[in-house]
Amino acid sequence: MLSLDQIPHHIRHGIVGSRLIQIRGRVTQVTGTLLKAVVPGVRIGELCYLRNPDNSLSLQAEVIGFAQHQALLIPLGEMYGISSNTEVSPTGQCIRLGWVNICWGRCWMV
């Protein structure tokens, strides 16, 4: 059996840093343009994918806060089709706007 020391650094880094299970949540409430969803482990500024298994809805949303163990999300596109069946999948990434990275309430040059 191989130990981690026998695996090249770039491959080892990919193995150690990868998610082995895909975390998903579900939309629980929609008020205006604000979505509430139960999604374990998300962070403020993180992008999530919104998908409906029963139609072609697929768009991104940003986590902007939390309320009573639910994530508050703002969709980045047309909301038509969002329902209680909408799955929320965190990406682990933040918004990238050209030369600036915006993530977790901070802004820095790329």
Curated annotation (Swiss-Prot):
Q: List the induction conditions.
A: Temperature seems to play the major role in regulation of transcription of the lcrE-containing operon of pYV, whereas Ca(2+) concentration has only a moderate effect at 37 degrees Celsius, and no effect at room temperature.
Entry's InterPro entries? ATPase_F1/V1/A1_a/bsu_N
Keyword annotations? Plasmid
Q: Mention one GO biological process in which this protein takes part, according to its record.
A: proton transmembrane transport
Query: Which named protein is this?
Result: Uncharacterized 12.2 kDa protein in lcrE 5'region
Species name: Yersinia enterocolitica
